[in-house]
Design a protein with these regions (language model features):
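Outer-membrane beta-barrel signature, preferentially recognizing the C-terminal barrel domain
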Residues: 281-305, 389, 420, 434, ...
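Conserved C-terminal beta-signal and adjacent last beta-strands/turns
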Residues: 28-33, 255-259, 432, 443-444, ...
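Extracytoplasmic beta-strand/coil segments of soluble accessory domains associated
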Residues: 104, 108-144
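Gram-negative outer-membrane beta-barrel transporters
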Residues: 401, 405-407, 496-499, 519-603
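Flexible loop and strand-edge segments within Gram-negative outer membrane beta-barrel domains
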Residues: 236-243, 247, 261-340, 464
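N-terminal periplasmic "start-of-domain" segments of outer-membrane beta-barrel proteins
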Residues: 65-96, 126
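Short strand-turn segments of transmembrane beta-barrel domains in outer membranes
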Residues: 175, 186-187, 192-220, 230-231, ...
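Short acidic/polar hinge/loop motifs at secondary-structure boundaries
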Residues: 126, 145-172, 191-193, 252
Length: 660
């Protein structure tokens, strides 16, 4: 139950979410749906599908210790430290502290995530988890799948501002049973703010390279509904030739509160991007350009009683993409419109025998354009081709608690019309052993599958060529986790192993070839270690202030593969061998809060190792007015995440915000 703005919980809440404020806490949830736990600092937790409505965090207010937390989610509720998944939660408070200007930049501070940026400030980046590709993760907005079925390059083209976010939850590792076949190596769920407590928020930003931005969000309660509207525009002239951009966002949300703590959530959104894409997809063409639009609409319910909960969902999103291989010309130009329609239902039943969950989803995808699909009988303008597919999935899962053990097992059955007559079963088993209050040990095994994207199946241009008879990719994954947690210290160590077959990649069979071809790699194995440590320092080092904390995160990974005939790989064989992140937060006097963020990464096969240092200063002018200063890449390091696409050097920006 929430007892203060600082979110101290002392007993179970019967709502469909459990929010809590802590530092690198480990939350215990046996099964997951769409993960939702609010914490004041990055936390490693297990979570389930949740949507929260907490007020904005006060950066100057210390976090409170949580006692006896139980999180009630859409599938099951379990006490603290009995997690069967490893989930990193980035809270609203940490989002406000970090020197990030986009979700992609924010995710760069998590060691287990590889953010290969093409354009800065959230223009475009390939985000992957534990050596997987950017096509192998699912992106969700309030539990609704917003991943691009066309290409993972576009999966973050949806309407969201950092100030809209309550928390971001990163599930590391396969999660097909929870999110479907797209969650091959993990999932990222963005939970937005629903509370109308902050009725007005406005922010203006300016900086180097003619950076300009404006945000406006309003919220109000009307009858039984909570409503909010968020608008924004960001632009820059670019940090080098042909890297200019404009980004527009609009997001409307309504929550209808029904009797017995039932609710319905509606969200409508629009995103538009126009940007120079200097060497984004090929160094041979530095003057590329792209214009994308995304519209989303969804309705989600949380209904039922104490024993039986129902979560119906219906959604639609529309992607528009215009790409020019040479800006301002028709050479290599392509136009596409993609529609994704989906409907699903989760039924969750709790009894003395445990918790049983039955789920089902129907998803239809269609594309019309001049590159993807097969020729239309009646072509129109650019839209000469059409393609479609339908996916049906059913899942069954049961979770039981036996003394200090939490055991969960289930399977997902999937059928896609591109694989006529074939049914794929993806089982998963998780075990959590919690011998002592401060310790827990977890082991999981699962099977996963991913279908080719629309680009994988059909895309061809002068430097890319789709392969014939492309097949789904499969993997078996295992993970072992050890976690230790007190009120001031949290640590975790995990080992992961993924053995994949038929992995999809864009490759060359001879280095002299001009085009990459989409192709199934025979075998690929990723394995590695992740370690994290978080310390709350304010009480022990008072000079750091209430904000004092230190967090360290490290990833080490190796890869073995068998890819007969492959001379060059564009994605699958280019992975992070090492990634280390460190964050130190502290107060400067009574009104200023500072956060230093260090990142080091060493990538195999493409870019050279590098390190960057960022700083964010937040100055509380009044209770309603704040000023911020962001210094990104203070050392002016010259680096690239993708060979041939250099990233910005030192970039200074400032902002002022008002909230009511």
């Amino acid at each position: 139950m929430q007892t203060s703005v600082a979110l101290r919980f002392r007993r179970m809440t019967r709502k469909s979410y459990g929010a809590f404020n802590t530092m690198h806490r480990i939350i215990n949830i046996g099964t997951l749906t769409s993960l939702a736990l609010a914490c004041a600092y990055t936390s490693t937790v297990s979570a389930q599908n949740v949507a929260a409505s907490e007020p904005e965090y006060n950066l100057g207010e210390p976090d409170k210790e949580l006692t006896g937390v139980t999180v009630t989610a859409s599938k099951t509720a379990t006490p603290l430290n009995e997690a069967t998944r490893l989930v990193t939660v980035i809270s609203a408070r940490e989002i406000a502290q970090t020197p990030a200007r986009s979700i992609q930049e924010l995710l760069n501070y998590v060691a287990g995530i590889d953010v290969a940026q093409r354009g800065a400030q959230g223009v475009q980046a390939d985000v992957s988890i534990r050596g997987g590709s950017h096509e192998q993760i699912v992106i969700l907005l309030n539990g609704i799948n917003v991943s691009s079925s066309k290409s993972g390059h576009l999966s973050f083209d949806f309407p969201i501002n950092l100030s809209d976010i309550e928390r971001i939850e990163v599930l590391r590792g396969p999660s097909a049973l929870i999110y479907g076949t797209g969650a091959f190596s993990g999932a990222i769920n963005i939970i937005t703010k629903h509370s109308a407590e902050t009725s007005l928020y406005a922010k203006a930003t300016a900086g180097m390279h003619r950076l300009m931005g404006a945000e406006l969000r309003g919220a109000m309660t009307w009858g039984k509904t909570e409503n909010s509207l968020s608008l924004s525009r960001r632009s820059s002239a670019g940090y080098r030739t042909n890297t200019d951009y404009e980004i527009y966002n609009a997001l409307w949300q309504t929550r209808l509160n029904l009797p017995a703590e039932n609710k319905m959530d509606l969200q409508l959104g629009y995103n538009e991007k126009k940007f120079g894409a200097n060497s984004f997809y090929s160094a041979k063409y530095p003057n590329q350009y792209e214009h994308t639009q995304r519209m989303i609409a969804s309705l989600r319910g949380d209904l039922g009683g104490e024993r039986l909960r129902l979560l119906p969902t219906i959604y639609w999103d529309r992607e528009y993409d215009c790409f020019e291989l040479v800006r301002g010309t028709t050479f290599g130009q392509n136009h596409h419109i993609v529609n994704n329609y989906g409907a699903g239902l989760i039924a969750n039943y709790s009894s003395l025998l445990g918790t049983t969950t039955l789920g089902g989803e129907l998803r239809y995808e269609e594309v019309i354009g001049n590159k993807l699909g097969t020729p239309r009988a009646k072509p129109e303008s650019y839209y000469t081709k059409f393609g479609s597919r339908t996916n049906v999935s059913l899942s069954l899962e049961h979770t039981v608690k036996l003394d200090k053990w939490l055991i969960s097992a289930g399977t997902l059955m999937s059928h896609n019309t591109l694989l006529s007559g074939k049914y794929t079963f993806l089982p998963s088993v998780s075990v959590n052993y919690h011998p002592l209050d401060r310790w827990s040990f977890v082991a999981t095994w699962s099977r996963s599958m991913r279908l080719p994207t629309l680009n994988d199946l059909w895309y061809t241009d002068p430097v890319h060529k789709h392969g014939d008879n492309l097949q789904p990719e499969y993997a078996h994954s295992f993970e072992a986790i050890a976690k230790y947690q007190t009120s001031h210290v949290e640590a975790h160590l995990s080992y992961f192993l993924m053995k994949g077959s038929n992995l999809i990649d864009w490759v060359k069979f001879d280095r002299t070839e001009t085009a990459f071809t989409s192709h199934n790699i025979a075998e690929l194995t990723n394995q590695g270690l992740e370690a994290g440590l978080a310390l709350r320092l304010g009480e022990y080092l008072p000079f750091l202030g209430d904000a004092g904390r230190l967090s360290l995160d490290y990833l080490y990974m190796t890869q073995q593969h068998r890819a007969p005939g492959v001379a060059m790989s564009k994605y699958a064989l280019n992975y992070l061998r090492h990634k280390f992140t460190a964050q130190l937060a502290h107060n400067v006097g009574s009104r200023i809060e500072a956060l230093w963020a260090l990142r080091y990464q060493d990538r195999v096969n493409q870019a050279s190792p590098f390190a960057t240092l960022d700083l964010k200063l937040d100055y509380r002018l009044t209770n309603h007015l704040r000023a911020g200063l962001e210094l990104n890449n203070i050392t002016d390091t010259q680096y690239a995440d993708i060979a041939g696409v250099p990233q910005p050097g030192f970039w200074l920006s400032g902002s002022i915000s008002y909230s009511l």
